[in-house]
């Protein structure tokens, strides 16, 4: 299987994660406001599973290091498979809440609040279980990210009040998503080998861990998304007849969103061997910065903002960049 051989390459993979995790939400935007997020999500989850299989039979089956994809699945112990799948279930619950928040409050709010909380809590959780890197720089980076979250929330509140359009539900969903999202990565990490080059028996290598994680997402979605269709956060209940009305392009957008997200997840897990779980997860969740850039500059979610709101948005970007820089240096 493919294994990165240097910290520099691992950091590059983490930045790919950041771009992917911060950009997949655009695929939901491209489906249009008439295509509800519950319908988008079926295709999105299929894209996640599809890419995990493709990755396993390509990068997971090439090279001479570690264990091959199929060989690794055959030798995996049940409790490790279960841990990776539980990670998928927790992620799916958190991501449904995040996508709902994004539909209600927009990318520029849902990502900084939801994913920002996930970054701060997730880095702490992963560092406690697997210490790696300079803790002063690591937690200094987390503190800067938390500051960016607070600034973004203040900007959103100020802008919403000026438009007389405050979505408490969007903020609540974002916070709930962030708390859950902080937990999923640890379950996947606990199922994995400590050495990619010389993997322990019974444990999962990155590629099989990603596959079983995706299976957990797929299976749980059959229940979670069905329930959300019956009892939506906003709007009328949906049926599978509504899903069947989607065009090929609309369904393709959803699948593409899942593929883009799982490219990010895969690069993060693969990078963790050299960067450590706390740093690979934390840098990946810098996706918030990318999503906020999309939301502010492409989708114009803060269009018509006052000068004070624009100043807050600028300060949010500065705080995020400072936090990400500290996370990179923490593992150097």
Label every PLM stretch briefly.
Residues 1-332:
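Polytopic alpha-helical membrane proteins, predominantly small-molecule transporters/carriers
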């Amino acid at each position: 299987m493919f294994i990165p051989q240097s910290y520099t390459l691992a950091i590059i993979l983490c930045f790919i994660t950041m771009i992917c995790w911060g950009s997949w939400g655009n695929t939901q935007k491209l489906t249009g406001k008439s295509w509800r997020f519950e319908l988008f999500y079926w295709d999105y989850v299929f894209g996640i599973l599809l890419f995990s299989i493709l990755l396993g039979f390509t990068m997971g089956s090439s090279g001479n290091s570690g264990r091959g994809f199929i060989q690794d699945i055959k030798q995996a112990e049940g409790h490790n498979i279960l841990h990776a799948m539980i990670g998928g279930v927790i992620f799916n619950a958190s991501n449904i809440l995040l996508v709902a928040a994004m539909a209600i409050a927009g990318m520029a709010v849902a990502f900084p609040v939801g994913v920002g909380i996930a970054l701060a809590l997730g880095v702490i959780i992963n560092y406690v279980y697997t210490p790696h890197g300079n803790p002063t720089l690591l937690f200094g980076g987390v503190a800067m990210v938390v500051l960016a979250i607070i600034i973004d929330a203040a900007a959103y509140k100020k802008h919403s009040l000026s438009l007389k359009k405050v979505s408490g539900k969007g903020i609540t969903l974002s916070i709930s998503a962030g708390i859950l999202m902080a937990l999923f990565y640890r379950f996947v990490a606990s199922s994995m080998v400590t050495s990619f080059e010389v993997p322990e028996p019974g444990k999962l290598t990155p590629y099989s861990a990603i596959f079983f994680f995706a299976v957990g997402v797929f299976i749980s979605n059959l229940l979670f998304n069905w329930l959300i269709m019956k009892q939506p956060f906003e709007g009328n209940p949906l049926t599978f007849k509504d899903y069947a009305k989607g065009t090929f392009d609309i369904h393709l957008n959803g699948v593409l969103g899942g593929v883009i997200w799982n490219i990010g997840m895969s690069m993060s897990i693969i990078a963790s061997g050299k960067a450590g779980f706390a740093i690979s997860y934390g840098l990946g969740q810098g996706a918030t910065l990318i999503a906020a850039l999309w939301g502010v500059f492409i989708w114009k979610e803060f269009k018509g903002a006052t000068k004070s709101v624009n100043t807050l948005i600028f300060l949010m970007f500065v705080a995020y960049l400072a936090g990400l820089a500290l996370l990179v240096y923490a593992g150097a």
